[in-house]
Amino acid sequence: MQLSDFNYELPAALIAQHPLANRTDSRLLEVKADGLNHALLLDRQFKDILSLVKPGDLLVFNNTKVIPARLHGKKETGGIVELLIERISGEKQTWVQIRASKVLKTGSIVHIHNHAGETFSVEIIGYDGRFYEVSFPDNVFSLLERFGELPLPPYIEHQPDGEDAQRYQTVVAKNPGAVAAPTAGLHFDEAILQKIKNLGVNQATVTLHVGAGTFTPVREEDLSKHKMHYEWFSIPNETLQAIEATKENGGRVIAVGTTSLRALESQAASGQSGGETNLFITPGYQFKTVDCLLTNFHLPKSTLLMLVSAFAGMDHIRAAYQHAIEQKYRFFSYGDAMFLCRLENTKP
């Protein structure tokens, strides 16, 4: 499997820079198999999710909460640096991406500042070739609240503002730790969640803290050589029980977003209900838990595009993305959504 198999051309005008006025105003592309190995593509509104779910189905949300994970600072030499938390590994330790003119050495000190003129210092204690291990002087979360900035994705070109502070979080966000939102969940508001519940559709949660590695480009053309980044996840017992009951009663497990799917499939593969996962899903992967997937449109050559291609079929996804571009769907984090079911679970 080659990286170039997952490339496509996207007009920049289709990259959503701001959220729509209401969460549920987005469009929804339903991708179905027609029995002839072709994709049947249905243009819908997100509110039509109410007609796509069925009594007895289980919607699984990622309840991670985006933290203010971007920090600005200076090296001891005065050079400007930017830190982006990749994942938090302890009360006072993190792995981070650092944007600087040169690679920082172990033992280097970086002085972090905020707009109020306050400062604190961190020490570089390790480097694995991609991410730096950094020691903080105090609790990481408390320092991020005072010094951090909301880490909007690199393709969103404006500085974070009050709108982003509200709309780049899902309404189910509960557990702080993500540096990017689980974007499929951004389409839901409290009202539509209640309507779904009234239909007899159950809801459950997992936690997977989306790391900065989700935006790191895949550099290996041969995908078998790609090293997937790690992300921390946890699945409560009540969610595992809900999945088991759903399967026994003939319902479908519907993952809201690729992060929910990765958490569920990581548990199914390892038997562990929590920990760090570097599960890399590409075409040929045998899914064990998730039947249907609600997801946004993903970047070219990204591991998330590979995941949805594995889930719904490469030809179906190529056709769906081409259709979405022609119909001017909005792409990426603040964009529109797709509803996919696994090929063996999709009926004509």
Swiss-Prot record:
Query: What EC number(s) does this enzyme carry?
Result: 2.4.99.17
Q: Name one GO cellular component term.
A: cytoplasm
Q: In which pathway does it act?
A: tRNA modification; tRNA-queuosine biosynthesis
The record's keywords, sorted A to Z, are: Cytoplasm, Queuosine biosynthesis, S-adenosyl-L-methionine, Transferase
Q: Indicate whether Zinc appears among the record's keywords.
A: no
- Quaternary structure, from the entry: Monomer.
Annotated function: Transfers and isomerizes the ribose moiety from AdoMet to the 7-aminomethyl group of 7-deazaguanine (preQ1-tRNA) to give epoxyqueuosine (oQ-tRNA).
Q: What is this protein called?
A: S-adenosylmethionine:tRNA ribosyltransferase-isomerase
